[in-house]
């Protein structure tokens, strides 16, 4: 049976842990609000850009014209999956869920492509796949530190260049899609070639006038669209990470409080037993002296 000192030490240790988890929960909640604000600010621009590109692509398809190489279908022999995870842990199943979703995607598409490569954004994903001896073509380091749109642009530009050169035939983004603070959905999204939305053909019958030209607009807008998709995935992943960590730390804080209550009860019972034993010894000694 543990001594009173041992129980006191355990209570103190759990209280210290509770302070840490409570502080981490508050920090994650603040970061989550900022990430949500960034997503809301980005969404209108991304939606309008997607609609505009969809109309131009649909009109080009109606004219039986290949509008741009990024939109043109071709034989897909080599694919690459860019997996977005976090640099830090203590986020529940955030990293494990997207890693397992990626592995399932690799199995499901093993016959579709001659070769599927992996790239990672985030140390947790890199470590996960290395531990399973899966080759990682490239690890994008330092992306999560001071997350900025310029980093998304650089990643998008690299994959656009590799796609246009024929080095890779399809590029996918694997990330956690943010639903709420307690819900994140692991998804695999096709980045390249660009897929037009299902309702893109709604504006194909309207004879829009594009200046300087349809082709010039696509040359300018398509790289922005690819960069925006990468940026959106990074923001969604960041919000999902903070939400998952906030939930995990809230659960850890509650568990710590329950453990403190249990240890306190154990301490009081042990102390009561100790006092009772002392009193009995005193009474027994007094009786022996009579």
UniProtKB/Swiss-Prot annotation:
Principal location listed in the UniProt entry: membrane
KW Membrane (keyword) present: yes
Keywords: ATP synthesis, Cell inner membrane, Cell membrane, CF(1), Hydrogen ion transport, Ion transport, Membrane, Transport
MF GO annotations: ATP binding; proton-transporting ATP synthase activity, rotational mechanism
Described function: Produces ATP from ADP in the presence of a proton gradient across the membrane. The gamma chain is believed to be important in regulating ATPase activity and the flow of protons through the CF(0) complex.
Family: Belongs to the ATPase gamma chain family.
Record protein name field: ATP synthase gamma chain
Organism: Anaeromyxobacter sp. (strain Fw109-5)
Gene: atpG
């Amino acid at each position: 049976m543990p001594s009173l000192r041992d129980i006191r030490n355990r209570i103190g240790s759990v209280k210290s842990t509770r302070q840490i988890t409570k502080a981490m929960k508050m920090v994650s909640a603040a970061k989550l609000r900022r990430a949500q604000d960034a997503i809301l600010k980005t969404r209108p621009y991304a939606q309008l850009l997607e609609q505009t590109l969809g109309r131009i692509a649909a009109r080009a398809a109606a004219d039986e014209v290949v509008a741009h190489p990024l939109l043109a279908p071709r034989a897909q022999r080599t694919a690459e999956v860019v997996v977005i995870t976090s640099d830090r842990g203590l986020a529940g199943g955030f990293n494990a869920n997207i890693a397992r979703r990626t592995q399932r995607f690799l199995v499901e598409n093993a016959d579709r492509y001659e070769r599927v490569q992996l790239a990672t954004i985030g140390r947790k994903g890199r470590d996960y796949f290395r531990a399973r001896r899966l080759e990682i073509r490239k690890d994008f380091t330092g992306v999560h530190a001071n997350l900025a749109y310029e980093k998304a642009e650089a990643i998008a530009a690299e994959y656009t260049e590799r796609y246009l050169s024929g080095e890779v035939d399809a590029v996918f983004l694997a990330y956690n899609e943010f639903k709420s603070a307690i819900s994140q959905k692991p998804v695999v999204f096709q980045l390249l070639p660009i897929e037009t939305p299902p309702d893109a053909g709604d504006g194909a019958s309207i004879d829009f006038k594009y200046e300087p030209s349809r082709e010039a607009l696509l040359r300018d807008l398509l790289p922005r669209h690819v960069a925006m998709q990468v940026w959106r995935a990074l923001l969604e992943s960041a919000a999902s990470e903070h939400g998952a960590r906030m939930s995990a730390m809230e659960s850890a804080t509650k568990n710590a409080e329950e453990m403190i209550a249990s240890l306190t009860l154990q301490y009081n019972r042990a102390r009561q037993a100790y006092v009772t034993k002392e009193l009995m010894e005193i009474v027994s000694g007094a009786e022996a002296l009579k």
